[in-house]
Design a protein with these regions (language model features):
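Alpha-helical transmembrane segments
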Residues: 1, 82, 132-136
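Juxtamembrane/interface alpha-helical elements of multi-pass membrane proteins
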Residues: 1-51
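Hydrophobic alpha-helical segments characteristic of transmembrane helices
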Residues: 10-31, 63, 70-110
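Hydrophobic alpha-helical transmembrane segments in multi-pass membrane proteins
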Residues: 41, 74-75, 125, 129
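Membrane-anchoring/interfacial helices and their immediately flanking loops
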Residues: 46-66
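Bilayer-spanning, highly hydrophobic alpha-helical transmembrane segments
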Residues: 103, 107-151
Length: 151
């Protein structure tokens, strides 16, 4: 589910922009456009969704809700089901898009913090190695100078 949720904001963003431009969009077409960009788990779930869509979009959305019981996916399915009933819910779609964008930003910030910590550890190790090298180098320089002047 974690890998699906990492890809879901991109998928929803694509759905949002398609539906905000035109009303007569088939969800299956949007999914087919997204599949080449999806990760393995997301493509698997969307593939099942496309198989279920043969029985109707409403059925496919209900099955998706059952397979991925995550708040954002459930909200997405509810929004799409209400669109099928003829309601214009761009404001709800926009709200969910903003929520998913915030989630994506939060995820990216966490990733950035992890990378910073890893970078700081690597820098510390490199500084220790360099300091050790400098100490050993100057130690041998001093020993060499002492031998030179003791003759």
């Amino acid at each position: 589910i974690k890998s699906i949720m990492s890809d879901f904001p991109s998928f929803y963003s694509m759905v949002y922009y398609q539906y905000s431009k035109a009303v007569n969009i088939f969800l299956s077409d949007v999914i087919k456009d997204f599949l080449p960009n999806a990760n393995q788990d997301m493509s698997y779930e969307l593939g099942i969704f496309l198989d279920n869509i043969e029985y109707g979009e409403g059925y496919a959305l209900k099955q998706l809700k059952k397979r991925i019981p995550v708040r954002h996916v459930i909200k997405f399915c509810d929004i799409m089901e209400s669109r099928l009933k003829g309601y214009d819910n761009i404001s709800q779609m926009t709200y969910l898009k903003n929520e998913l964008d915030d989630m994506r930003v939060h995820t990216l910030e966490e990733e950035l913090d992890k990378r910073k910590q890893k970078n700081e550890r690597t820098q510390l190790v490199l500084i220790i190695i360099l300091t050790t090298y400098i100490i050993v180098y100057y130690y041998f320089q001093v020993i060499s100078a002492m031998k030179l002047f003791s003759l």
